Amino acid sequence: METGKEIAIDIKGLYKSFGDNQVLRGVNLEVAKGENIVVLGRSGTGKSVLIKIVCGLLTQDEGSVIVLGEEVKNLSTKRLEALRLKVGFSFQLSALYDSMTVKENIAFPLMRNFTHLSKKEVAKRVDAVLDSVSLIKTRDQYPAELSGGQKKRIGIARTLVLRPEIMLYDEPTAGLDPISSIEINSLIHNIKEEFGVSAIIITHDLVCAKTTGDRLVMMFDGVVQKEGSFEEVFNSEDERIKSFYDYNFI
């Protein structure tokens, strides 16, 4: 990361175990404000655990995670809830409410967390994010009428409507066809450009990694093995990185 940039996420000496299984082993990582970081690695190497610790869904055993200037582990429940409004989490499966229309799904977290907003302001913000994800015409449809790629974009829009400063994406293109994957990759890039958010993107998709990431982090066995640009990481002589590239490259 370039020196002198303001830090959005600062992770130092992070350890996490589940029983006898040590998932993270001394992870260090910085994410600058306005930077997209892609975290790559085999299944089970601790990638998803890492971002769940960042947003306070899990607690580390050792180490520190400072998000937007606050040590996550030490926050009270009220302060943690306030921080989570600034940290958007896009899960692998977009858990939309089937009985609600698209606009109602997106408005739900806004109305729950910002009760002072008028109905007119809520509708305005919902339409704005739908326009950002290029799905304004679906506002009155139900989730069952949407494709997998559209559901993923609506899930992202539901997070964006809260105007977060950080986005966490967990396998954003998993299960999508190539065209939908390209649309999601473009959306992630555009969100950074339009909203200036920082992001950690967990993925196995090398096309996603190359098109969305300012910097790549390669993890093996709970440790950051290599970080740098896409070219720097995959020109590495490390045999495990070569093997990962050969296995995942399409």
Report residues per predicted region.
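Helix-to-loop junction immediately C-terminal to a conserved catalytic motif
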Residues: 55
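Conserved ABC ATPase "signature" region
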Residues: 71, 118-137
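Short coil-to-helix segment of the ABC ATPase nucleotide-binding domain corresponding to the Q-loop/switch region
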Residues: 100-108
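Conserved ABC ATPase signature
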Residues: 142-146, 150
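A short, proline-enriched helix->beta-strand linker immediately N-terminal to the Walker B motif
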Residues: 161-165
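Catalytic Walker B motif of ABC-type/P-loop ATPase nucleotide-binding domains
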Residues: 167-170
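Helix N-cap at the start of a conserved alpha-helix in ABC-type nucleotide-binding domains
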Residues: 178-180
